[in-house]
Amino acid sequence: MKKPVKIAILILLIALIAVLIWFGNVMMGNPVSHALASKAAKAFLSDRFSGTDYQMERITYSFKDGRYHAFITSPTSIDGDFSVCFSMLGEYCYDTYDSVLDGWNTAQRLESEYRKLTDTILNDPALPYDNTQIYSIMFGRLEIYPKEAFEDPNATDVPEYAILLEDLELNKIYNIKELGAKAGHLILYVDNDTISVEETARIMLDFRSMFDEADIPFYAMDFVLRHPRTEDGKSDDEEIRINDFLYQDIYEEGLADRIEIAIEQTAAYYAMLDQMK
């Protein structure tokens, strides 16, 4: 083999190795950068949180942003977890400690607890309504918003019954059922062959009965009754859609009339949103 050819092959191999190293560095990081980020994270804790029991749980590389993320925890604070981001050179980028101070960690904990509570019904295999399809939507949430959202004149999706974020106390153990009674919100999409106000009333009463029997309170319900999708995943446009139907209004006498009014109010709400676009 001629010398120029050997040199060309060698250059090609070196270039290929360089590309593989670069690709591996981008996808998985490297030990040197990991060590730099780990050292920087320890220095960050020493500088910012000296005298506390905060500790670094782990540090991982994210190929999505090409940075290292140190996850910080406290054994005495259920809402104290946050993360710190570092570059591959160990330079500080940002941290999420504000989510501890402003109450979002507490809000997420409470919402997760309420979600788990409602999932005991909505994810139960014995549930008489199908919640196993990829397009199925059935869950419960706590409505929690910051003061700025309540005061924003352009905010259209903040319910009056929502909990004020600033009222939450860090690390406080709340009665989730009591919060659910004040701000629990069920979002239910039910597939049914028959789309009618009567079927809507029957199914809403059924859900109220299930939640009452399980002693899982909620304050309001979003309810959509629609046809099942075809085998190819297509659906038609016929549906009944209701937003924020209150728990206290889900009782048999006059329910159909209240549903009719709620359907009109929901349609008007979406028409208003369309005009705002």
PLM region spans:
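Hydrophobic membrane-insertion alpha-helices, especially the h-region
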Residues: 6-25
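Non-cytosolic head/periplasmic domains of membrane-anchored proteins
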Residues: 95-195
